[in-house]
Curated annotation (Swiss-Prot):
Subcellular location: Cytoplasm; Cytoplasm, Cytoskeleton
Domain Fibronectin type-III: 404-504
Post-translational modification: Phosphorylated on serine and threonine residues.
Organism: Mus musculus
UniProt note on tissues of expression: Low abundance in brain and lung, with even lower levels in heart, liver, and kidney.
Reactions this protein catalyses: S-ubiquitinyl-[E2 ubiquitin-conjugating enzyme]-L-cysteine + [acceptor protein]-L-lysine = [E2 ubiquitin-conjugating enzyme]-L-cysteine + N(6)-ubiquitinyl-[acceptor protein]-L-lysine
Protein name in the entry: Probable E3 ubiquitin-protein ligase MID2
């Protein structure tokens, strides 16, 4: 059921009353003992202090055993005002009777407040936690054994009482009406923390300088009086906030550690699984090897037996032939010996002729019938040599990922759109293939993120050689290359190596060259030639008066390009870039479509849109480097001989640009298709040697663009 209107009003009134009483109590609390003022003194500074607290201040200022009578002054604990004492000491100060009357009325109002009669104001000033209230607290005043359970604890007396002892010791009259009664709490919670320097004082301040809990006397007359102090509440809030923040971080870290530990446990489990798998695979592979050895053993044994049978059969046939021949020869020998015993010449001649022919024939045929003995037939040239196989078996081991290859930068070559990468490896026999990865290098700062970004890398897989040529690259651009060696066990990467393509090569375009310029056969040199007037005029051709211009035969709309110009003895020239739409009948740099570095005798300037800026340049400048970074909207000029940066134009390119060259005297030679020198191979912007100043050669110059 809902609360009745009368109850709601009553509860609201009770809450308002409690709030007002708590506010009033804070005004009636002594700054030393933090209790309601008791026998308050009215100090000259208009603050008040308990008589007993003032007495403790004087006692704390004395050495042990000394009297407080010689003390003639002390400081107000609230405002630090020095209070002077007469010969009467503290008794010479006025009593704050009005404040005492207010305290008396406050205590009566606390007892007869709007809440239930069984719970007075002094009983509500301190509520123990549920953990404290659940403990069994024994009465500390009972004489019986065991003592009865306490029903209240007096904060002022610091003693817990049962109901009988409470009525006996705390009648409803002064000074007991000012005692604060709470639910029973243990003695350890009741005592609180006392000051280290003043044993009878509770801590109520925090010394920031010494990082220590102190009491009011420590700040007033103790060794902390000149230190920075803070209230316990402020320090409590700050420390609690810090602890909560650190606790949050610790909980987060514990969560991360738990996740990490879970991953480690998962890895351990995976190790167990993989180990079992590898052990099973090892047994399987070894069993297969043993099976192969057994099969080869049986096969070789069969071959030995077959060879033995074949050789013995052959030898047996030869033995039989020899035996047959021997038998015939023996018969013939016996017949011949018998004839030789015949003394009758006629009979001998009659029989010997036939025998002699047979012996001669047998002697001749025996040379044919006797077989040649081949000692190879004795199986002596047969040998079993498994030393190579034994060595392979001794080197039997599980396969590991190959050693990382190393890119040989000194062997790598480049053109304006290709780079050939060479690498070596000391582990080629265990490598099944290579993989080449590359991407555009945009600065050291983003290399780590670039390295971890899979989408930004181009990949060339399944390379079998130790070199590879990458085609279709941007001109004058730096790339990062990584080579990965791969086998069945895994892969390992080489260290990243930076390589760069050369700039786009170009030559001077005869169709755009001024009529009074002579172009060399290779298209790389231009020279002033007043006699060369045979060329016809076209809209593309430079046609300025007094200056003679030429342009390269390319239009650039991307990439980074570097070329150099050798000026030789020329003292009046302009070198830069221009849009195709730039006017051909005026000096380059005098319009918004061209940007140049120019020399006029001893003056060096950069010019754009009819504005110039002087540049500090060594007078011996004979070669000018030009770096066009179209993608980053920059055109820079350098002194390559001295590794000196001269000037950089910041340009927002909207159209393709063309290299342009103008001379007033002598000649120029172009060196194109060059790699950018290492001294300008850094991402940091270098300081230029420009200073704003009006030039006498072009009107309307105020600043460098």
């Amino acid at each position: 059921m809902g609360e009745s209107p009368a109850s709601a009003v009553l509860n609201a009134s009770a809450g308002l009353f409690s709030l007002k009483m708590e506010t009033l109590e804070s005004e009636l609390t002594c700054p030393i003992c933090l209790e309601l003022f008791e026998d308050p003194l009215l100090l000259p500074c208009a603050h008040s202090l308990c008589f007993s607290c003032a007495h403790r201040i004087l006692v704390s200022s004395c050495s042990s055993g000394e009297s407080i009578e010689p003390i003639t002054a002390f400081q107000c604990p609230t405002c630090r005002y020095v209070i002077s004492l007469n010969h009467r000491g503290l008794d010479g100060l006025k009593r704050n009777v009005t404040l005492q009357n207010i305290i008396d009325r406050f205590q009566k109002a606390s007892v007869s407040g709007p809440n239930s009669p069984s719970e007075s104001r002094r009983e509500r000033t301190y509520r123990p936690s549920s953990a404290m209230s659940s403990e069994r607290i024994a009465c500390q005043f009972c004489e019986q054994d065991p003592p009865r359970d306490a029903v209240k604890t007096c904060i002022t007396c610091e003693v817990s009482y049962c109901d009988r002892c409470l009525r006996a010791t705390h009648p409803n009259k002064k000074p007991f009406t000012s005692h604060r009664l709470v639910e029973p709490v243990s003695d350890t919670h009741l005592r609180g923390i006392t000051c280290l320097d003043h044993e009878n004082e509770k801590v109520n301040m925090y010394c920031v300088s010494d990082d220590q809990l102190i009491c009011a006397l420590c700040k007033l007359v103790g060794r902390h009086r000149d230190h920075q102090v803070a209230s316990l509440n402020d320090r409590f809030e700050k420390l609690k906030q810090t602890l909560e923040m650190n606790l949050t971080n610790l909980v987060k870290r514990n969560s991360e550690l738990e996740n990490q530990m879970a991953k480690l446990i998962q890895i351990c489990q995976q190790v167990e699984v993989n180990t079992a798998m590898h052990e099973a695979k090892l047994m399987e592979e070894c069993d297969e090897l043993v099976e192969i050895i057994q099969q080869r053993k049986q096969m070789i044994a069969v071959k030995i037996k077959e060879t033995k049978v074949m050789k013995l059969r052959k030898l047996a046939q030869q033995v039989a032939n020899c035996r047959q021949c021997l038998e015939r020869s023996t018969v013939l020998i016996n017949q011949a010996e018998h004839i030789l015993k015949e003394n009758d010449q006629a009979r001998f001649l009659q029989s010997a002729k036939n025998i002699a022919e047979r012996v001669a024939m047998a002697t001749a045929s025996s040379q044919v019938l006797i077989p040649d003995i081949n000692f190879n037939d004795a199986f002596e040239n047969f040998a079993l040599d498994f030393s190579r196989e034994k060595k392979l078996l001794e080197g039997l081991d599980y396969l590991t990922a190959p050693n990382p290859p190393s890119i040989r930068e000194e062997l790598c070559t480049a053109s304006h759109d290709t780079i050939t990468v060479h690498w070596i490896s000391d582990d080629e026999f265990s490598i099944s293939s290579y993989e080449l990865q590359y991407t555009i290098f945009t600065g050291q700062a983003n290399f780590i993120s670039l390295y971890n970004s899979v989408d930004s890398w181009m990949i060339v897989p399944n390379i079998k050689q130790n070199h590879y040529t990458v085609h279709g690259l941007q001109s004058g651009t730096r790339y990062i290359f990584i080579v990965k060696a791969i086998n069945q066990a895994g892969s390992r990467n080489s260290e990243p190596t930076r390589l760069k393509t050369n700039s786009q090569p170009f030559k001077l375009d005869p169709k755009m060259t001024h009529k009074k310029l002579k172009i060399s056969n290779d298209g790389l040199q231009m020279e002033k030639d007043e006699s060369s007037l045979k060329k016809s005029h076209t809209p593309e051709r430079f046609s300025g008066t007094g200056c003679y211009g030429a342009a390269g035969n390319i239009f650039i709309d991307s990439g980074c390009h570097y070329w150099e110009v050798v000026m030789g003895s020329s003292t009046w020239y302009a070198i830069g870039i221009a849009y195709k739409s730039a006017p051909k009948n005026e000096w380059i740099g005098k319009n918004a479509s061209s940007w140049v570095f120019s020399r006029c005798n001893s003056n060096f300037v950069v010019r754009h849109n009819n504005k110039e800026m002087l540049v500090d340049v060594p007078p011996q400048l004979k070669r000018l480097g030009v770096l066009l970074d179209y993608d980053n909207n920059m055109l820079s000029f350098y002194d390559p001989a001295n590794s000196l940066h001269l000037h950089t134009f910041d340009v927002t390119f909207i159209l393709p640009v063309c290299p342009t060259f103008t001379i007033w005297n002598k000649s120029l030679m172009i060196l194109s298709g060059l790699p950018a020198p290492d001294f300008i191979d850094y991402p940091e912007r270098q300081e230029c040697n420009c200073r704003p100043q009006e030039s006498p050669y072009v009107s309307g110059m105020k600043a460098c663009h």
